[in-house]
Amino acid sequence: MNDLKNAENGPDEADTPQGAPSQEPDPFVVLENLQAENTSLKDKLLRTLADMENLRRRTEKEVADAKTYGVTSFARDMLTFADNLHRALANVPAEARAKAEPAVQTLIEGLQLTERDFASRLERFGVKKIDPAGQKFDPNLHEALFEQPDESVPNGTVTQVIEPGYVIGERVLRPAKVGVSRGGPKG
């Protein structure tokens, strides 16, 4: 019966050998270990929170870029349409328009309206026209096709626009093709 009682209550002091080390760890060591673990977990938490914030910012930027630049290839293809429409209208001389029959005049007016409407729709999607006539040449926005001697304007000024350029957001969709002055005062 004593054996049963000892098994239920665990070993008593009489069963523990004299001089054996105590089984309980030092409370100061336990405290130091817990503080170190706490510091480590806080550090991991702060790093995880920072990673999540960076991921959120990066995702927001990617979504904004997708909205802004998602139509880039389509818009670039549509520029050919805009150029052709503009060239078609530019090739009808003003006197021919004035002498044209009313049906032809209505057709020309309809094409002009279509050109303006198309340009406004491009702008609605963030595509803006670059018309740099009279501005200083900027290789980021313009493509110089030729230089032209012109003493009346500063050197490096855009004197002629062969084909307008376009930007979408902060990016160049197509640089403006221009002629640049040479020989004037430094600009």
From Swiss-Prot:
Keywords, A to Z, come to: Chaperone, Cytoplasm, Stress response
CC per GO annotation: cytoplasm
Q: Which SUPFAM superfamilies match?
A: Coiled-coil domain of nucleotide exchange factor GrpE, Head domain of nucleotide exchange factor GrpE
- Annotated segments matching region Disordered: 1-26
Its GO biological process terms? protein folding
Domain of life from the UniProt record: Bacteria
Q: Does the keyword DNA repair apply?
A: no
Localization annotation: Cytoplasm
InterPro entries in alphabetical order: GrpE (IPR000740), GrpE_coiled_coil (IPR013805), GrpE_head (IPR009012)
What is an example of a GO molecular function annotated in this UniProt entry? protein homodimerization activity
**Role noted for this protein:** Participates actively in the response to hyperosmotic and heat shock by preventing the aggregation of stress-denatured proteins, in association with DnaK and GrpE. It is the nucleotide exchange factor for DnaK and may function as a thermosensor. Unfolded proteins bind initially to DnaJ; upon interaction with the DnaJ-bound protein, DnaK hydrolyzes its bound ATP, resulting in the formation of a stable complex. GrpE releases ADP from DnaK; ATP binding to DnaK triggers the release of the substrate protein, thus completing the reaction cycle.
Question: Belongs to which family?
Answer: Belongs to the GrpE family.
Quaternary structure, from the entry: Homodimer.
What this protein is called in its record is Protein GrpE
Q: Which organism is it from?
A: Methylocella silvestris (strain DSM 15510 / CIP 108128 / LMG 27833 / NCIMB 13906 / BL2)
